C-alpha cells in the first residue's frame, strides 16, 4: 500500500501571517495588508513557479513601499512553516512502521522548498519521494 500526504496544513502548518508579525501590530492589520496586495493570489503564482525576484517585482510595481516587506516573506518562510501537525506525524510514523510506502505532495515554491526542508529535515527521512 502507498499513502500520499499533503505537506502544507497536513504535515506542516502553513501560517503566512508569521512572516509579517514583526511589521504589523495585529492580525487585523496583516489581514488588511493581505487584502490590499492580493496576497493569496500572489502566493498561488509563487507556488506555480514564479521566482522570488519576479514575485517581489510584481508587488513593488504597484506598492513600492511594500517591496522589502514582501521580499522578507522569503527570508522568514521558516517562521511560516515552523509548526508540525503532530497528529499527522503520528499517523505517518505508524504507517511507516507498518511498511507502508509514504509519499508527499506539495506546492511550495522552489524558493521556499529548501527553507521548509531545512526546518523539517524529517521530511526527507520519512517520506520516500515528494511530488
What are these model-derived regions, one by one?
Residues 106:
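Short beta-strand/turn micro-motifs composed of small residues
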Residues 1-90, 97-98, 109-113:
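N-terminal helical cap/lid subdomain that shapes the substrate entry/recognition surface
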Residues 110-131:
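Substrate-recognition "cap/lid" segment bordering the active-site pocket of phosphatases
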Residues 98-99, 126:
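Structured helix-beta-strand junction loops
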